[in-house]
Amino acid sequence: MALANSRPLQIPTLENEILHNSNSPVFQLNSMGFTTRADTISNPGTDLIGNQPGMALDDNNLAGSSFSSSQEIKATKPKKDFGAPKKDNPLLEISKLIPVTGERPKPENRDSPLDDDVLHAVFLILWEMDPNQQGMTVKQLCDLLLQKHPDMSNLSTKLSNLISAKLNAYVKKIEKGEKTLTYALSREWSNSSPRRMLYIYRGILSPDYKEHAQAVTMQLKQQLETSGDTSDFNSNGKKKRESSSNQLVNNDSYSSSMTDMKNMSSNSSFSKNLNVGNLAFSLSPEFNIPYSTSPVSLNLSPSMSNNQQQLLTPNSASKSKNNNKKRNYMDEDTNESMTEPKKTKTTKPGKQTKSQSLSVLSTPKKGSSASLSTFASSKNISPDSSLSHNASSNTYVTAAAAAPRLSKLLPKNGFKKNSRSSSELAAIHKVISTQTPIESSSESSQYNSSSSSPVNSAAASSAESLSDINSSQDNGRESNPSSQESRNEVTNWMKIVRNGFLTHDIESPESITLDDLENIFN
């Protein structure tokens, strides 16, 4: 059907000025019957090259547009300069600067470290095959070694690594200046590509080479430090300033966080014992012992008259309750070491506060806000009040309840046993096991039955709970002392509380020596 078309095919001729490109046979899309809009859409780069209205179209520019653009892209990419030499470590020059006597004999001395067969064979190869001291690579040494000693192929799966390790170790001994060495060996990088390490046998070392080696080492290290500082200052000056500013910001945030941490730790109950505020020295849970504190501040001196009876106001009661929170927290941790019977709960009207659950000996829940210190310091409790609730048991307070004990947070193995720690623990256990409970039946003042204050009622309930606990612990122990003996026992008990529970003082953690500290943790 194409041959039957009567319309002749329009073939462009040379008269068309668009086809006057004689440099290269580039197909021009403009020569066909398309519009300029279609040309712009199909070849949008023509407007960028300079084909603007009113300008003559340069076919050479159009022909070389793609090639020139690719050349510009290649020119923007940085080229690697493979011919630039690498910066050598100046410390590698130490072995070349070691003084020698000038003699280069055959290495026949088999003293250490040349008592090694591989190293001695390598030295012989260097002496024989490198008389001009041009240096030999590990590959060359390995090939020659296998030719002369085929049995050494079984020494290692890769003999070249073994040879390189032995040679480098020998060179480092020379750089350190060991006096046992006799022969000089140096190493340097080759100028060929790829660069290889060359080893050179230089002869016999001079007698005073040790001093020269140390002096050269110090000089090269100083030179390396100064050159490194100068280059860093020139190239990374801006980065250092930025990093210093960032470091200042980080230091500010760090100091603020440390301040918050110190404030938080100062409010905690462990800040005094565990020394959390001191970031340079923090104590582990092994030191959770009240060294210089007074865990029990009870005034148990006998009252001889009714005039000494005192009642606490609600303000003073709440104040003493707040002061005992930190002590109560520590006593709760240590109460598990003593076997206590299950406590009975008393049901009384009133709301229960959080501070009541932090009592010293985990007393039962009660309606008033009085704590154990309120009960102990009221000094107006007689055995009549306790007998009204529990007639079968006497009311007393044991000193062992507040004795310094190790924390339950200790690891299972505990301290490492030595004479000092064993004696201290034995003294603690002795006081706890031999402490005699103090009965308050004869030394207390006469009880005023008409008094019905909430403090007295709370004290009575506390006395009942304490009598139940201590009577179960000391079951079978019967004592009926007279009033004079009881008064003496109270005085002795007060001395024990005020002077401490141990036969000798426990030193504070700050006064411990390094040897004792090492014995504790090891």
UniProtKB/Swiss-Prot annotation:
Residues 62-73, 222-236, 244-260, 300-314, 355-366, 379-391, 468-489 have a biased composition (Polar residues). One of its GO terms (molecular function) is NuA4 histone acetyltransferase complex binding. Residues 56-88, 222-268, 300-391, 433-489 are annotated as: Disordered. GO terms for cellular component: cytoplasm; mitochondrion; nucleus. Residues 368-378, 439-467 have a biased composition (Low complexity). GO terms for biological process: aerobic respiration. Disruption phenotype: Impairs growth on glycerol carbon source. Residues 74-88 have a biased composition (Basic and acidic residues). It holds the Pfam family WH_GDS1. Involved in nuclear control of mitochondria. Present with 2280 molecules/cell in log phase SD medium. This is Protein GDS1. The lineage of its organism: Eukaryota, Fungi, Dikarya, Ascomycota, Saccharomycotina.
